[in-house]
Curated annotation (Swiss-Prot):
Family: Belongs to the three-finger toxin family. Short-chain subfamily. Type I alpha-neurotoxin sub-subfamily.
Sorted UniProt keywords: Acetylcholine receptor inhibiting toxin, Disulfide bond, Ion channel impairing toxin, Neurotoxin, Postsynaptic neurotoxin, Secreted, Toxin
Name of this chain's protein: Short neurotoxin 1
Tissues expressing the protein: Expressed by the venom gland.
Cellular component terms (Gene Ontology): extracellular region
Annotated organism of origin: Naja oxiana (Central Asian cobra)
Cellular location(s): Secreted
Entry annotated with the keyword Aminoacyl-tRNA synthetase: no
Amino acid sequence: LECHNQQSSQPPTTKTCSGETNCYKKWWSDHRGTIIERGCGCPKVKPGVNLNCCRTDRCNN
């Protein structure tokens, strides 16, 4: 599985995720604006953090 792993609005970069079945994108807002984090897996998130998990290559941009 290949997942995007760039932060927020950085240029897209990807990572090969051995043994993973999900990519994730999570986002939240703070004083800097909207922060977006991407990577492999499907993490648990705190209340107030939005999470989207998906199962295809580069699906989490």
